From Swiss-Prot:
Chain positions found as Phosphohistidine: 338
Function: Member of a two-component regulatory system MalK/MalR. Involved in the activation of maeA, maeN and yflS in presence of malate. Probably activates MalR by phosphorylation.
An MF annotation (GO) of this entry: ATP binding
Organism of derivation: Bacillus subtilis (strain 168)
Histidine kinase domain location: 335-527
Membrane topology designation: Multi-pass membrane protein
Entry-linked PANTHER family: SENSOR HISTIDINE KINASE DCUS (PTHR43547:SF10), TWO-COMPONENT HISTIDINE KINASE (PTHR43547)
Protein known as: Sensor histidine kinase MalK
SUPFAM superfamilies named among the record's database cross-references: ATPase domain of HSP90 chaperone/DNA topoisomerase II/histidine kinase, Sensory domain-like, Sporulation response regulatory protein Spo0B
Compartments where located: Cell membrane
Length: 533
C-alpha cells in the first residue's frame, strides 16, 4: 500500500511553497525595479556630470586654445571625485584625450568606438569597453562661444561599480526574504496544526470514511432523522424522514426550510432554547401518528442545533406487539414445561415406591384432566398458534395459583390474515395477565374466558373475580402509562386498545367494586378457507 503524507505535513509543505513562490515573485519584482532605478540614477549622474564639465568655460577655452591642459586635468579630477564617477575624459574633435584618470593615457585616442556620435554634436549614452574596462558612458559635445563644436566630454561609471551598488542596495532585501521564509515556515506549521485541531486530528481519508459510514447509517436506519441548525433551518433529512414526509402529504424539499414550516408540531426550536431533550413524544401530523425524540446538539458547551428522530407509531406498536407475543409464548412454554416436570417427579416417586396401583390412578387422573382441558380448545380453535398459546396460558395461570377456564361456543376458524392471530394473542394475553394481577390477592382466583364466532364476527369475553375498578380508574385505564400497580406499568391495556383499533373492533369494560371486571371485545374476523381434498 502506497504510503501518503499526513495532512499536517502536506499543509506545511503547501503553505511553504506558496510563501516561497510569493517571496520569489516579490524578490524578482523589487530586484528588477531596484536595478532599473540604480542604472537610471547612474546614467543621470554621468549625463549631468558630462553636461556640467562641457558647459564649464575652462573646458571650451582649453580645447579651443590648446592651453591650460593641467588646469583642465585638475578640474576633471575634482569633478570625478565629487560625483563618484569612474572617469571624466575631455577630447578634441579628433577623439584625442585631453584629460584622463591615468595621465599616461592623455594624448591618445579615446577607446570604445562609441564617441563618433558626440563628435557629430549628438548627446548620447552607451555601454562599451575602454581602458578601465566595461562602463556606462555619457557623451556631451563642447561648444565655443561662437557656437562651434571644439570637442566633447565623456563621463563613465564602470559596470562592475554599478553592479556593486545594485548588490549593496539589494542586501536588505536578501535579509527580509530570508526572515520572511523563516516566518513563513513557522506560520505554515502553525496553520497546519490549527487545521489539524479543527478537524479533530483526523486525516482526510478518515473524514471521508466517517462521512460514508454516517451516510450509510442515516440512510439505512428505519427511523426518520432530521437535523436543524441554531436558527431552526433544516440541514439534514434522511431517506426515511423524506418517506414519512410524503406519507404526511409534505412533498417539498425540506433542506434549508424552517422546521416550523415543514413540521408545525415540532419542538426542535424549544429544545435549542431550553437545551433539554424531549423524548417519546406522541405527535399526529396530517393523520399520521409519530413517536418523536428531540435532543439538542452541543459543541464545546454551545448549542449549535438539534436532532429529531421519529417513527411511524403503528410500526413501533407492531414491534412492541411482536415482542409481547414472543414473551407470552415463552412464558406459556415455561409454565407448561414446569407443570409437566412436577408430574414426572410424582410419577418417578411412585415408581420408586412401587406404588403401582396409585401410579395407575394418578396417570388416569392426569389423562382425564388433560383431556377435559385440552379437548375443547384443540377441537374448536383451528389456529394451532392460538390454541397452543391458550393451552400454555392455562398452565401458566395454574402455576401462579389461579384458575383459567376457556369456553368455546362453537368452532373458532383460523384467520385468513395471520397478523390477526398475532393481534389476538396480544389482546387475550394482556387481558388475562390483567385478570391475574386483579385476583392475586383475592381468596377466589378465577378467570373465565369465552369465545364465539358468528357471521364474520369474533366475540371474546374475559372475566375475573378481582376487586373491580373505580369509575375514575375505568376512565383512565387505557391511557398509556396509567396503572394502579406502580411505576413502569400501564402499557398492557394501552397496547390492547391499540390492537383492537387496528382490527377495527371495539371493547367494553364492565367493573364493579368487589364484584370483578369483565372485558367484552367484538372484532371483525375473516375465516381462512380450508381445503377438504
Amino acid at each position: 500500500m502506497k504510503k501518503t503524507l499526513k495532512l499536517q505535513t502536506r499543509l506545511t509543505i503547501f503553505v511553504c511553497i506558496v510563501v516561497l513562490i510569493a517571496l520569489l515573485i516579490t524578490f524578482f519584482t523589487v530586484g528588477a525595479q531596484t536595478t532599473k532605478r540604480i542604472r537610471d540614477q547612474e546614467k543621470a549622474t554621468a549625463l549631468q556630470t558630462a553636461e556640467m564639465v562641457a558647459e564649464a568655460p575652462m573646458t571650451a577655452a582649453a580645447l579651443e586654445s590648446g592651453k591650460k591642459q593641467k588646469e583642465l586635468q585638475s578640474y576633471t579630477k575634482r569633478v570625478q571625485k565629487i560625483t563618484g564617477t569612474e572617469f571624466v575624459v575631455v577630447m578634441d574633435m579628433n577623439g584625442i584625450r585631453k584629460t584622463h584618470p591615468d595621465p599616461s593615457k592623455i594624448g591618445k585616442k579615446f577607446r570604445g568606438g562609441d564617441e563618433s556620435e558626440v563628435l557629430k554634436g549628438h548627446v548620447h549614452i552607451s555601454t562599451a569597453s575602454g581602458t578601465l574596462g566595461k562602463s556606462q558612458r555619457a557623451f556631451v559635445p563642447v561648444y565655443a562661444e561662437n557656437g562651434k563644436q571644439v570637442g566633447a566630454v565623456a563621463v563613465g561609471i564602470t559596470v562592475n561599480e554599478i553592479d556593486e551598488v545594485i548588490s549593496h542596495s539589494l542586501r536588505p532585501l536578501y535579509f527580509i526574504i530570508c526572515v520572511s521564509i523563516f516566518v513563513g515556515v513557522i506560520g505554515a506549521v502553525i496553520v497546519a496544526r490549527t487545521v489539524k485541531n479543527i478537524m479533530y486530528g483526523l486525516e482526510p481519508y478518515e473524514i471521508a470514511t466517517l462521512l460514508e459510514e454516517r451516510s450509510a447509517m442515516l440512510e439505512s436506519t428505519k427511523e426518520g432523522i432530521l437535523a436543524v441548525d441554531e436558527h431552526g433551518k433544516i440541514k439534514l433529512a434522511n431517506a426515511e424522514a423524506k418517506r414519512l414526509f410524503v406519507k404526511m402529504g409534505i412533498n417539498t424539499n425540506p433542506i434549508d426550510q424552517d422546521v416550523d414550516d415543514i413540521l408545525p408540531k415540532s419542538r426542535l426550536k424549544k429544545v435549542i432554547e431550553t437545551k433539554k431533550p424531549l423524548q417519546d413524544r406522541d405527535v399526529r401530523i396530517n393523520g399520521l401518528e409519530l413517536v418523536f425524540n428531540e435532543v439538542p446538539i452541543q459543541l464545546k458547551g454551545q448549542t449549535v442545533g438539534a436532532i429529531a428522530t421519529f417513527r411511524d407509531k403503528t410500526e413501533v406498536k407492531h414491534l412492541a406487539e411482536q415482542l409481547s407475543g414472543v414473551k407470552m409464548y415463552a412464558n406459556a412454554l415455561r409454565a407448561q414445561s414446569h407443570e409437566f416436570m412436577n408430574k414426572l417427579h410424582v410419577i418417578l416417586g411412585l415408581v420408586q415406591l412401587k406404588e403401582y396401583d396409585d401410579l395407575g390412578d394418578y396417570i388416569k387422573d392426569i389423562a382425564i384432566q388433560q383431556k377435559s382441558e385440552t379437548s375443547e380448545i384443540i377441537n374448536d380453535v383451528k389456529s394451532s398458534v392460538l390454541a397452543g398459546f391458550l393451552l400454555g396460558k392455562q398452565s401458566f395461570i395454574r402455576e401462579q395459583g389461579a384458575n383459567l377456564d376457556i369456553e368455546c361456543n362453537g368452532v373458532i376458524p383460523n384467520a385468513a390474515d395471520p397478523s390477526v392471530i398475532h393481534e389476538l394473542i396480544t389482546i387475550i394475553g394482556n387481558l388475562i395477565n390483567n385478570g391475574l394481577d386483579a385476583v392475586a390477592d383475592m381468596p377466589k382466583k378465577q378467570i373465565t374466558m369465552s369465545m364465539r364466532f358468528h357471521n364474520s364476527i369474533l366475540d371474546i369475553e374475559i372475566t375475573d373475580t378481582g376487586a373491580g375498578m373505580s369509575e375514575e380508574d375505568q376512565a383512565k385505564v387505557f391511557e398509556q402509562g396509567y396503572s394502579t400497580k406502580g411505576k413502569n406499568r400501564g402499557f398492557g391495556l394501552y397496547f390492547t386498545q391499540q390492537s383492537i383499533e387496528n382490527l377495527k373492533g371495539q371493547m367494553i369494560l364492565t367493573s364493579e367494586k368487589n364484584e370483578g371486571t369483565t372485558f367484552s371485545i367484538r372484532i371483525p374476523y375473516e375465516p381462512k378457507e380450508e381445503n377438504h381434498d
